[in-house]
């Protein structure tokens, strides 16, 4: 698998490419399948349809890897928090975890209640071409904890930050419990057939440097070490969004560092490129214009070169109204321009 070879810094005929949120609303096929499912959450919990939407971008775009179609919030949901997705508002939990007593709401063994995810993985791996990799994933403990504490997405993270500074022991207790569930979840994804795993720290930038490493990075690092100790052949990818200023302190037992669009690729290469394969980092909005897209591709490839050590990706997820023709062209463009 070209993608796996690249994650292990082995020679590849070109720079492999896949895209975050490559299964999404910009594809009419996805929208049709989602309509058949009934709701976003129903789609996540239906192995047959989750398999279908996972495979769609591989067939349409010819990317080098599929990423499991699911949502990071299925873990806290299976820990006991009732989850709903609301039109125009996004996900929301009906309960929040803000006190020691609230911790009692959380049930252990969430990884054992996610059978629909593992069944989807079995189906995807059976249907996916053997040269195409399948990526499993989870959210970071910090990112999941913010949803569990706030009850929904937030711009200020007021409750989470209040807990961090006024009751750090409680926050650590939440993070530890989430981390244990995530370790089991990734292990079961690997046993079900994924070829690599990725941890998304979507809200990393909410924290200042002095607390980021204690309350987020250390937990991600621990999860990565857990996976590498048990499955050394499985590449582990970490994606902490928006921490360009912290790159000097990044270390741990993982393989691939995801670079978001706001982090200069040359900076990431200078700070991390000798230790980790870098993944990224095209600004997704460039896909609105073919010329701007090509300009971005040329810039990234000029920095990363044609040697191993790079997986091409967007620096954030695909936007719902991006022209699919440009996504198809992006894959061809990267393959052609990075050919060894």
UniProtKB/Swiss-Prot annotation:
GO terms for molecular function: uroporphyrinogen decarboxylase activity. Its EC number is 4.1.1.37. Keywords: Cytoplasm, Decarboxylase, Lyase, Porphyrin biosynthesis. GO terms for cellular component: cytosol. Substrate binds at residues 21-25, 40, 71, 147, 202, 316. It comes from the Bacteria. Its main location: cytoplasm. The record marks 71 as: Transition state stabilizer. Pathway: Porphyrin-containing compound metabolism; protoporphyrin-IX biosynthesis; coproporphyrinogen-III from 5-aminolevulinate: step 4/4. It is found in: Cytoplasm. One of its GO terms (biological process) is protoporphyrinogen IX biosynthetic process from glutamate. HAMAP family: URO_D. NCBIfam families: hemE. Homodimer. Belongs to the uroporphyrinogen decarboxylase family. Catalyzes the decarboxylation of four acetate groups of uroporphyrinogen-III to yield coproporphyrinogen-III. This is Uroporphyrinogen decarboxylase. It comes from Wolinella succinogenes (strain ATCC 29543 / DSM 1740 / CCUG 13145 / JCM 31913 / LMG 7466 / NCTC 11488 / FDC 602W).
